[in-house]
Amino acid sequence: MKKDIAVFGAGAAGMFVALAAQARGLSVALFEPHARTPNNFAISGGLFPAAGSRFQRASGIDDSPQAWLDDLRAFAPGMVNERIAQSVAEALPLATDFLVDGCAAPFRFLPDMIAPGHNRRRFHSIEPASGAAMHAWFRQAVQAQPAIAWFEALPQVRRQSRGFAVDGAQDVLEVDQLVLAGGGFGANAQMVERFIPGMAGALNNGSVTNDGSAMALGLQWGAQVWGMDGYQGQGHTNPGGATRLGMAIPSLGGILVNRQGQRFVAEDIGPSALAPRVLSQPGGVALEVFDAAIEAQLGNHWAYQQALAAGQVMSAGSVHELAAQAGVDAQALAQTLEQVAACSGGQIDPLGRRAFARSLSAPLKASWVTGALSHTQGGLLTDADGRVLLEDGQIMTGVFAAGGCAAGLSGRGADGYLPGNGLAQAFGLGWCLAQALG
Protein backbone atom coordinates (compact mmCIF):
# COMPACT_ATOMS: atom_id res chain seq x y z
CA MET A 1 0.00 0.00 0.00
CA LYS A 2 1.30 3.46 -0.90
CA LYS A 3 0.63 6.75 0.88
CA ASP A 4 2.23 10.13 0.46
CA ILE A 5 2.85 10.70 4.16
CA ALA A 6 2.61 8.89 7.47
CA VAL A 7 1.81 10.87 10.62
CA PHE A 8 2.72 9.36 13.98
CA GLY A 9 0.42 10.70 16.69
CA ALA A 10 -3.14 12.01 16.56
CA GLY A 11 -2.92 14.91 18.96
CA ALA A 12 -3.44 18.53 17.96
CA ALA A 13 -0.44 18.68 15.62
CA GLY A 14 -0.94 15.26 14.06
CA MET A 15 -4.61 15.70 13.27
CA PHE A 16 -4.12 19.26 12.06
CA VAL A 17 -1.30 18.21 9.71
CA ALA A 18 -3.41 15.33 8.40
CA LEU A 19 -6.30 17.67 7.58
CA ALA A 20 -4.07 20.32 6.01
CA ALA A 21 -2.12 17.75 3.97
CA GLN A 22 -5.21 16.06 2.55
CA ALA A 23 -6.55 19.48 1.60
CA ARG A 24 -3.49 19.78 -0.65
CA GLY A 25 -4.31 16.49 -2.33
CA LEU A 26 -1.92 14.28 -0.36
CA SER A 27 -2.85 10.84 0.94
CA VAL A 28 -2.22 10.36 4.65
CA ALA A 29 -1.76 7.42 7.01
CA LEU A 30 -2.46 8.61 10.56
CA PHE A 31 -1.26 6.34 13.38
CA GLU A 32 -2.48 6.64 16.97
CA PRO A 33 -1.56 3.67 19.17
CA HIS A 34 -3.17 5.32 22.22
CA ALA A 35 -6.52 6.06 20.60
CA ARG A 36 -8.46 4.94 23.69
CA THR A 37 -6.43 7.03 26.14
CA PRO A 38 -6.88 10.82 26.44
CA ASN A 39 -3.84 12.63 25.09
CA ASN A 40 -2.63 16.08 26.08
CA PHE A 41 -4.84 17.71 23.45
CA ALA A 42 -7.95 16.12 24.94
CA ILE A 43 -7.14 17.20 28.50
CA SER A 44 -5.91 20.68 27.61
CA GLY A 45 -7.87 23.89 28.01
CA GLY A 46 -8.38 23.97 24.24
CA LEU A 47 -7.22 27.59 23.90
CA PHE A 48 -4.88 28.98 21.25
CA PRO A 49 -3.76 32.48 20.25
CA ALA A 50 -4.22 33.60 16.65
CA ALA A 51 -2.98 37.17 16.69
CA GLY A 52 -4.41 39.19 13.82
CA SER A 53 -7.29 36.85 13.03
CA ARG A 54 -10.35 38.12 11.22
CA PHE A 55 -12.40 37.17 14.27
CA GLN A 56 -10.41 39.61 16.39
CA ARG A 57 -10.89 42.34 13.82
CA ALA A 58 -14.64 41.71 13.80
CA SER A 59 -14.59 42.22 17.58
CA GLY A 60 -12.61 45.45 17.31
CA ILE A 61 -9.33 43.99 18.60
CA ASP A 62 -6.23 45.51 17.01
CA ASP A 63 -3.65 42.71 17.03
CA SER A 64 -0.98 41.25 14.79
CA PRO A 65 1.50 38.37 14.59
CA GLN A 66 4.26 40.85 15.45
CA ALA A 67 2.42 41.99 18.59
CA TRP A 68 2.17 38.37 19.76
CA LEU A 69 5.87 37.85 19.01
CA ASP A 70 6.72 40.96 21.01
CA ASP A 71 4.74 39.56 23.96
CA LEU A 72 6.47 36.19 23.65
CA ARG A 73 9.94 37.74 23.61
CA ALA A 74 9.13 40.02 26.52
CA PHE A 75 7.70 37.15 28.57
CA ALA A 76 10.58 34.77 27.81
CA PRO A 77 13.62 36.97 27.14
CA GLY A 78 16.46 35.00 25.63
CA MET A 79 14.40 31.80 25.71
CA VAL A 80 12.48 31.98 22.41
CA ASN A 81 12.98 29.35 19.72
CA GLU A 82 13.63 31.88 16.97
CA ARG A 83 13.88 29.18 14.31
CA ILE A 84 10.11 28.79 14.34
CA ALA A 85 8.62 31.75 16.24
CA GLN A 86 8.14 34.14 13.30
CA SER A 87 6.67 31.53 10.99
CA VAL A 88 4.32 30.23 13.69
CA ALA A 89 3.10 33.75 14.48
CA GLU A 90 2.32 34.46 10.84
CA ALA A 91 0.76 31.04 10.26
CA LEU A 92 -1.74 31.04 13.13
CA PRO A 93 -4.37 33.31 11.49
CA LEU A 94 -4.01 31.27 8.28
CA ALA A 95 -4.41 28.01 10.18
CA THR A 96 -7.52 29.37 11.88
CA ASP A 97 -9.03 30.44 8.55
CA PHE A 98 -8.30 27.00 7.10
CA LEU A 99 -10.02 25.19 9.96
CA VAL A 100 -13.09 27.43 9.82
CA ASP A 101 -13.43 27.84 6.05
CA GLY A 102 -11.91 24.60 4.82
CA CYS A 103 -13.08 22.23 7.54
CA ALA A 104 -16.17 23.97 8.97
CA ALA A 105 -14.65 24.03 12.45
CA PRO A 106 -16.97 25.75 14.94
CA PHE A 107 -14.22 28.00 16.27
CA ARG A 108 -14.79 31.36 17.89
CA PHE A 109 -12.84 34.23 19.37
CA LEU A 110 -12.97 34.59 23.17
CA PRO A 111 -13.12 38.35 23.79
CA ASP A 112 -13.27 37.94 27.58
CA MET A 113 -10.26 35.63 27.95
CA ILE A 114 -7.37 37.34 29.71
CA ALA A 115 -4.04 35.50 29.94
CA PRO A 116 -0.78 36.41 31.70
CA GLY A 117 1.87 37.70 29.32
CA HIS A 118 -0.59 38.65 26.58
CA ASN A 119 -1.19 42.37 26.14
CA ARG A 120 -4.17 41.75 23.89
CA ARG A 121 -7.12 39.39 23.98
CA ARG A 122 -6.32 36.87 21.29
CA PHE A 123 -7.48 33.43 22.39
CA HIS A 124 -9.70 31.27 20.23
CA SER A 125 -11.41 27.97 20.92
CA ILE A 126 -14.32 25.76 20.06
CA GLU A 127 -17.79 25.83 21.60
CA PRO A 128 -17.72 24.79 24.43
CA ALA A 129 -14.17 25.97 25.14
CA SER A 130 -12.37 22.79 26.18
CA GLY A 131 -9.66 20.50 24.92
CA ALA A 132 -12.06 17.57 25.11
CA ALA A 133 -14.54 19.24 22.77
CA MET A 134 -11.84 20.37 20.35
CA HIS A 135 -10.21 16.94 20.32
CA ALA A 136 -13.56 15.29 19.62
CA TRP A 137 -14.20 17.63 16.70
CA PHE A 138 -10.75 16.94 15.20
CA ARG A 139 -11.14 13.18 15.62
CA GLN A 140 -14.47 13.25 13.79
CA ALA A 141 -13.05 15.50 11.08
CA VAL A 142 -10.03 13.33 10.25
CA GLN A 143 -12.04 10.12 10.30
CA ALA A 144 -14.52 11.63 7.85
CA GLN A 145 -11.83 12.30 5.24
CA PRO A 146 -11.37 9.47 2.70
CA ALA A 147 -7.79 10.59 2.00
CA ILE A 148 -6.82 10.00 5.65
CA ALA A 149 -6.40 6.35 6.65
CA TRP A 150 -6.73 5.88 10.43
CA PHE A 151 -4.70 3.19 12.20
CA GLU A 152 -4.85 2.38 15.91
CA ALA A 153 -1.49 0.66 15.96
CA LEU A 154 2.08 1.24 17.10
CA PRO A 155 3.98 1.65 13.85
CA GLN A 156 7.40 0.24 13.16
CA VAL A 157 9.36 2.21 10.59
CA ARG A 158 12.52 1.68 8.62
CA ARG A 159 14.27 4.03 6.26
CA GLN A 160 14.71 3.03 2.65
CA SER A 161 16.75 4.44 -0.20
CA ARG A 162 13.66 6.50 -1.03
CA GLY A 163 11.06 7.10 1.62
CA PHE A 164 10.03 4.83 4.47
CA ALA A 165 8.42 1.46 5.06
CA VAL A 166 5.87 1.60 7.86
CA ASP A 167 4.55 -1.57 9.44
CA GLY A 168 1.49 -0.96 11.55
CA ALA A 169 -1.38 -1.54 9.19
CA GLN A 170 -2.60 -4.77 7.62
CA ASP A 171 -0.01 -4.25 4.92
CA VAL A 172 3.37 -2.56 5.02
CA LEU A 173 2.93 1.04 3.90
CA GLU A 174 5.34 2.77 1.58
CA VAL A 175 5.44 6.50 2.30
CA ASP A 176 7.51 9.36 0.94
CA GLN A 177 7.60 11.49 4.06
CA LEU A 178 7.20 10.99 7.78
CA VAL A 179 5.71 13.40 10.33
CA LEU A 180 6.53 12.80 13.99
CA ALA A 181 3.67 14.30 16.01
CA GLY A 182 3.65 12.29 19.22
CA GLY A 183 3.67 13.74 22.72
CA GLY A 184 6.58 14.92 24.82
CA PHE A 185 8.19 13.05 27.71
CA GLY A 186 6.31 14.28 30.78
CA ALA A 187 5.19 10.75 31.68
CA ASN A 188 8.68 9.29 31.24
CA ALA A 189 10.14 9.48 34.76
CA GLN A 190 13.69 8.73 33.62
CA MET A 191 13.68 11.51 31.02
CA VAL A 192 12.11 13.99 33.46
CA GLU A 193 14.77 13.20 36.06
CA ARG A 194 17.49 13.65 33.43
CA PHE A 195 16.29 16.86 31.78
CA ILE A 196 14.00 18.52 34.37
CA PRO A 197 15.32 17.30 37.73
CA GLY A 198 13.45 20.00 39.62
CA MET A 199 10.15 18.36 38.64
CA ALA A 200 11.24 14.76 39.24
CA GLY A 201 8.57 13.14 41.36
CA ALA A 202 6.12 16.02 40.88
CA LEU A 203 2.52 15.37 39.93
CA ASN A 204 2.13 14.80 36.19
CA ASN A 205 -1.24 16.11 35.11
CA GLY A 206 -0.45 15.59 31.47
CA SER A 207 -1.31 12.45 29.55
CA VAL A 208 0.24 9.10 30.38
CA THR A 209 0.88 8.77 26.64
CA ASN A 210 3.69 11.36 26.83
CA ASP A 211 6.37 8.69 26.92
CA GLY A 212 8.94 10.30 24.62
CA SER A 213 8.73 7.52 22.02
CA ALA A 214 8.28 9.78 18.98
CA MET A 215 11.22 11.88 20.12
CA ALA A 216 13.29 8.72 20.59
CA LEU A 217 12.76 7.76 16.96
CA GLY A 218 14.18 11.08 15.79
CA LEU A 219 17.12 10.77 18.17
CA GLN A 220 17.81 7.30 16.82
CA TRP A 221 18.34 8.89 13.41
CA GLY A 222 20.65 11.62 14.72
CA ALA A 223 18.23 14.48 15.32
CA GLN A 224 19.20 17.60 17.23
CA VAL A 225 17.13 18.61 20.27
CA TRP A 226 16.44 21.99 21.86
CA GLY A 227 15.09 23.30 25.16
CA MET A 228 14.92 19.96 26.93
CA ASP A 229 14.65 21.59 30.37
CA GLY A 230 11.63 23.64 29.29
CA TYR A 231 8.16 22.64 30.42
CA GLN A 232 4.67 23.89 31.03
CA GLY A 233 3.99 23.80 34.71
CA GLN A 234 0.49 24.10 36.11
CA GLY A 235 0.25 25.99 39.37
CA HIS A 236 -3.54 25.77 39.61
CA THR A 237 -3.88 21.98 39.80
CA ASN A 238 -5.99 20.50 42.58
CA PRO A 239 -4.07 17.89 44.63
CA GLY A 240 -4.54 14.51 43.02
CA GLY A 241 -4.47 16.00 39.54
CA ALA A 242 -8.00 15.13 38.43
CA THR A 243 -9.06 18.78 38.17
CA ARG A 244 -7.56 22.25 37.92
CA LEU A 245 -8.88 25.77 38.31
CA GLY A 246 -7.57 27.20 35.04
CA MET A 247 -5.35 30.23 34.59
CA ALA A 248 -7.89 33.08 34.73
CA ILE A 249 -8.40 33.61 38.47
CA PRO A 250 -5.25 35.70 39.19
CA SER A 251 -6.00 37.93 36.19
CA LEU A 252 -9.44 38.59 37.69
CA GLY A 253 -8.03 39.42 41.14
CA GLY A 254 -7.38 36.10 42.86
CA ILE A 255 -4.36 35.42 45.06
CA LEU A 256 -2.33 32.49 46.40
CA VAL A 257 -1.46 32.00 50.06
CA ASN A 258 0.49 29.26 51.82
CA ARG A 259 -0.57 27.26 54.87
CA GLN A 260 0.38 30.22 57.05
CA GLY A 261 -2.13 32.42 55.23
CA GLN A 262 0.58 34.53 53.59
CA ARG A 263 1.18 35.39 49.95
CA PHE A 264 4.52 34.18 48.60
CA VAL A 265 4.54 35.03 44.88
CA ALA A 266 3.41 37.59 42.32
CA GLU A 267 0.48 35.59 41.01
CA ASP A 268 0.55 37.24 37.57
CA ILE A 269 3.79 35.54 36.51
CA GLY A 270 1.69 32.93 34.71
CA PRO A 271 0.36 29.47 35.49
CA SER A 272 3.50 27.67 34.35
CA ALA A 273 5.97 29.68 36.41
CA LEU A 274 3.68 29.33 39.43
CA ALA A 275 4.13 25.55 39.54
CA PRO A 276 7.63 25.39 41.08
CA ARG A 277 6.79 28.31 43.39
CA VAL A 278 3.77 26.47 44.77
CA LEU A 279 5.80 23.28 45.18
CA SER A 280 8.37 25.21 47.22
CA GLN A 281 5.78 26.03 49.91
CA PRO A 282 5.12 23.85 52.99
CA GLY A 283 3.44 20.66 51.85
CA GLY A 284 3.88 21.68 48.21
CA VAL A 285 0.45 23.32 48.20
CA ALA A 286 -1.19 26.75 48.21
CA LEU A 287 -4.67 28.07 48.80
CA GLU A 288 -6.07 29.99 45.83
CA VAL A 289 -8.37 32.66 47.23
CA PHE A 290 -10.94 34.65 45.23
CA ASP A 291 -14.58 35.66 45.64
CA ALA A 292 -18.06 35.14 44.26
CA ALA A 293 -17.71 38.10 41.89
CA ILE A 294 -14.71 36.39 40.26
CA GLU A 295 -16.48 33.04 40.16
CA ALA A 296 -19.37 34.68 38.30
CA GLN A 297 -16.96 35.40 35.43
CA LEU A 298 -15.89 31.75 35.12
CA GLY A 299 -19.12 30.31 33.77
CA ASN A 300 -17.55 29.45 30.39
CA HIS A 301 -14.26 28.23 31.85
CA TRP A 302 -14.43 24.46 31.46
CA ALA A 303 -11.53 23.64 33.80
CA TYR A 304 -12.97 25.66 36.67
CA GLN A 305 -16.44 24.21 36.21
CA GLN A 306 -14.96 20.71 36.41
CA ALA A 307 -13.20 21.56 39.67
CA LEU A 308 -16.36 23.13 41.07
CA ALA A 309 -18.42 20.06 40.19
CA ALA A 310 -15.80 17.85 41.86
CA GLY A 311 -16.22 19.69 45.16
CA GLN A 312 -12.80 21.35 45.08
CA VAL A 313 -14.06 24.88 45.83
CA MET A 314 -14.86 26.17 49.33
CA SER A 315 -17.34 28.98 50.01
CA ALA A 316 -17.41 31.20 53.08
CA GLY A 317 -19.24 34.25 54.31
CA SER A 318 -16.21 35.75 56.03
CA VAL A 319 -12.43 35.59 56.22
CA HIS A 320 -12.56 33.76 59.55
CA GLU A 321 -15.03 31.21 58.22
CA LEU A 322 -12.81 30.57 55.19
CA ALA A 323 -9.71 30.24 57.37
CA ALA A 324 -11.48 27.69 59.55
CA GLN A 325 -12.56 25.62 56.54
CA ALA A 326 -9.10 25.68 54.99
CA GLY A 327 -7.17 25.27 58.23
CA VAL A 328 -5.02 28.38 57.83
CA ASP A 329 -4.29 31.17 60.31
CA ALA A 330 -7.28 33.52 60.33
CA GLN A 331 -5.40 36.61 61.47
CA ALA A 332 -2.69 36.17 58.85
CA LEU A 333 -5.25 35.60 56.10
CA ALA A 334 -7.18 38.71 57.15
CA GLN A 335 -3.99 40.77 57.08
CA THR A 336 -3.16 39.38 53.65
CA LEU A 337 -6.53 40.42 52.26
CA GLU A 338 -6.08 43.89 53.75
CA GLN A 339 -2.73 44.16 51.95
CA VAL A 340 -4.34 43.03 48.70
CA ALA A 341 -7.00 45.72 49.10
CA ALA A 342 -4.27 48.32 49.56
CA CYS A 343 -2.44 47.10 46.47
CA SER A 344 -5.63 47.15 44.41
CA GLY A 345 -5.92 50.79 45.46
CA GLY A 346 -2.48 51.65 44.11
CA GLN A 347 0.02 50.59 46.77
CA ILE A 348 3.14 48.88 45.38
CA ASP A 349 3.13 45.14 45.94
CA PRO A 350 6.29 44.01 47.78
CA LEU A 351 6.19 40.75 45.78
CA GLY A 352 6.18 42.62 42.48
CA ARG A 353 2.70 41.88 41.19
CA ARG A 354 1.91 44.47 38.55
CA ALA A 355 -1.87 44.62 38.76
CA PHE A 356 -4.66 43.66 41.11
CA ALA A 357 -7.99 43.73 39.34
CA ARG A 358 -9.90 44.37 42.54
CA SER A 359 -9.97 43.78 46.29
CA LEU A 360 -11.67 40.60 47.48
CA SER A 361 -14.89 40.64 49.47
CA ALA A 362 -17.36 38.15 50.93
CA PRO A 363 -18.69 35.75 49.93
CA LEU A 364 -15.20 34.32 49.52
CA LYS A 365 -14.07 31.27 47.56
CA ALA A 366 -10.94 29.16 47.83
CA SER A 367 -9.38 25.94 46.59
CA TRP A 368 -6.21 24.05 47.43
CA VAL A 369 -3.78 23.77 44.52
CA THR A 370 -0.39 22.26 43.87
CA GLY A 371 2.27 22.50 41.18
CA ALA A 372 2.22 19.94 38.39
CA LEU A 373 3.99 19.12 35.15
CA SER A 374 1.57 19.50 32.24
CA HIS A 375 3.85 18.91 29.29
CA THR A 376 7.43 19.28 28.21
CA GLN A 377 8.60 21.99 25.81
CA GLY A 378 11.87 20.53 24.61
CA GLY A 379 12.13 18.20 21.66
CA LEU A 380 13.33 17.60 18.14
CA LEU A 381 14.70 20.80 16.66
CA THR A 382 13.14 21.80 13.34
CA ASP A 383 13.44 24.58 10.83
CA ALA A 384 10.61 27.03 10.20
CA ASP A 385 8.80 24.47 8.03
CA GLY A 386 8.96 21.65 10.55
CA ARG A 387 11.85 19.76 8.92
CA VAL A 388 13.84 17.91 11.58
CA LEU A 389 17.45 19.06 11.86
CA LEU A 390 20.41 16.77 12.37
CA GLU A 391 23.08 17.41 14.98
CA ASP A 392 25.23 19.12 12.33
CA GLY A 393 22.37 21.46 11.40
CA GLN A 394 21.53 19.76 8.12
CA ILE A 395 17.97 18.74 7.28
CA MET A 396 16.97 15.14 7.97
CA THR A 397 15.60 14.04 4.61
CA GLY A 398 11.89 13.33 4.59
CA VAL A 399 11.32 13.70 8.35
CA PHE A 400 9.18 16.43 9.89
CA ALA A 401 8.03 17.07 13.46
CA ALA A 402 5.45 19.16 15.30
CA GLY A 403 3.56 18.96 18.56
CA GLY A 404 4.87 17.67 21.86
CA CYS A 405 7.82 15.71 20.46
CA ALA A 406 9.16 18.79 18.64
CA ALA A 407 10.95 21.76 20.18
CA GLY A 408 8.45 24.30 21.46
CA LEU A 409 8.23 28.06 21.08
CA SER A 410 10.11 28.99 24.22
CA GLY A 411 11.81 27.38 27.16
CA ARG A 412 14.09 27.11 29.91
CA GLY A 413 12.40 25.79 33.00
CA ALA A 414 8.78 26.74 33.62
CA ASP A 415 9.16 30.51 33.31
CA GLY A 416 9.41 30.57 29.53
CA TYR A 417 6.01 29.05 28.83
CA LEU A 418 3.59 31.70 27.59
CA PRO A 419 -0.04 30.53 27.91
CA GLY A 420 -1.24 29.06 24.64
CA ASN A 421 2.22 28.09 23.38
CA GLY A 422 1.35 24.40 23.07
CA LEU A 423 -1.53 24.66 20.61
CA ALA A 424 0.12 27.67 18.95
CA GLN A 425 3.08 25.49 17.99
CA ALA A 426 0.84 22.57 17.02
CA PHE A 427 -1.35 24.59 14.66
CA GLY A 428 1.17 27.22 13.51
CA LEU A 429 4.12 24.91 12.86
CA GLY A 430 1.64 22.30 11.64
CA TRP A 431 0.40 24.73 8.98
CA CYS A 432 3.93 25.54 7.79
CA LEU A 433 4.83 21.86 7.80
CA ALA A 434 1.79 20.85 5.76
CA GLN A 435 2.59 23.45 3.10
CA ALA A 436 6.15 22.08 2.82
CA LEU A 437 5.08 18.45 2.30
CA GLY A 438 5.03 16.88 -1.12
Describe each PLM feature range.
Residues 177-237, 423, 429-432:
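Glycine-rich loop(s) and the adjacent beta-strand/alpha-helix scaffold that form part
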Residues 215-217, 221-332:
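An anion/pyrophosphate-binding glycine-rich loop and adjacent beta-alpha core
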Residues 19, 24, 31, 304-306, ...:
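C-terminal structured subdomain/cap of oxidoreductase catalytic cores
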Residues 332-413:
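A glycine-rich dinucleotide-binding beta-alpha-beta segment and adjacent secondary-structure elements
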Residues 2-3, 169-177:
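Core beta-strand elements of the Rossmann-like FAD/NAD(P) dinucleotide-binding domain
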Residues 33-153, 256-257, 263:
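Conserved N-terminal/central alpha/beta ligand/cofactor-binding core
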Residues 4-30:
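N-terminal Rossmann-like FAD-binding beta1-loop-alpha1 element of flavoenzymes
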Residues 151-163:
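A conserved short coil-to-beta-strand element within the FAD-binding core of flavoproteins
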